[in-house]
């Protein structure tokens, strides 16, 4: 199994998917590769590569070459990795308007994706070195979480997810102690 080093999102994703299926990291032979290199090794049919952990846009390359391998599961099946932005407590205390601006900008970007998808895909594609068309194709496998979805998540799902994630990270040795769950998120900026 090819994956990124311990503590990274691909490592966590692999550990999460394995745990949800009664397995652990100890049940697979692992090789540390970046998500892009892992996808490339899978596509190339590299000897000894039976599985790889990767993400978009590299997952799209695997999807485009089904003879090289089958996508078993994604974060659409196991929603445990999300793009977030975070600020230190000191920054939030000193700059609440800036933090609110970050949150508002995210939701404005979602509005732009709906109102001007082509322009949005061009901007986002340029950031990850993809054409607008390629980004549009790969973003179909993402979930854009609007304000209501964020509010729902932080109203209850976040606490349960954080507990499960902490238990898993403890079990695989990434963390030595569970964090104070009450200090993991400050959802006031999404209200």
Over which residues does each language-model region extend?
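Bilobed "Venus flytrap"/periplasmic-binding protein-like clamshell domains
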Residues: 1-63, 118, 159-160
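Short coil/loop linkers at secondary-structure junctions
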Residues: 19, 24-26, 129-131, 175-176
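Residues that form or immediately flank small-molecule/cofactor binding pockets and catalytic motifs
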Residues: 35, 76-77, 186-189
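Pocket-lining segment of extracytoplasmic ligand-binding domains
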Residues: 37-127
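Residue-level signal for threonine
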Residues: 88, 146, 186, 190
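Secondary-structure end/capping motifs
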Residues: 93-174
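Conserved C-terminal helix/tail region of periplasmic/extracytoplasmic solute-binding proteins
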Residues: 163-191
């Amino acid at each position: 199994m090819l994956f990124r080093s311990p503590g990274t999102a691909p490592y966590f994703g692999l550990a999460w998917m394995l745990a949800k299926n009664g397995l652990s990291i100890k049940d697979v032979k692992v090789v540390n590769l970046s998500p892009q290199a892992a996808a490339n090794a899978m596509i190339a049919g590299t000897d000894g590569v039976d599985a790889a952990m990767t993400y978009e846009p590299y997952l799209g390359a695997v999807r485009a070459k089904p003879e090289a391998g089958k996508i078993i599961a994604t974060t659409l099946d196991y929603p445990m990795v999300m793009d977030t932005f975070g600020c230190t407590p000191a920054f939030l205390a000193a700059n609440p308007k800036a933090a609110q601006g970050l949150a508002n900008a995210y939701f404005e970007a979602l509005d732009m994706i709906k109102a001007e998808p082509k322009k949005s895909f061009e901007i986002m594609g340029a950031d990850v070195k993809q054409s607008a068309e390629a980004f549009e194709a790969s973003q179909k496998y993402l979930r854009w979480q609007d304000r209501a979805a964020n509010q729902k998540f932080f109203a209850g799902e976040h606490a349960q997810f954080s507990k499960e994630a902490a238990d898993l990270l403890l079990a695989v040795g990434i963390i030595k102690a569970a964090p104070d769950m009450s200090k993991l998120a400050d959802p006031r900026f999404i209200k």
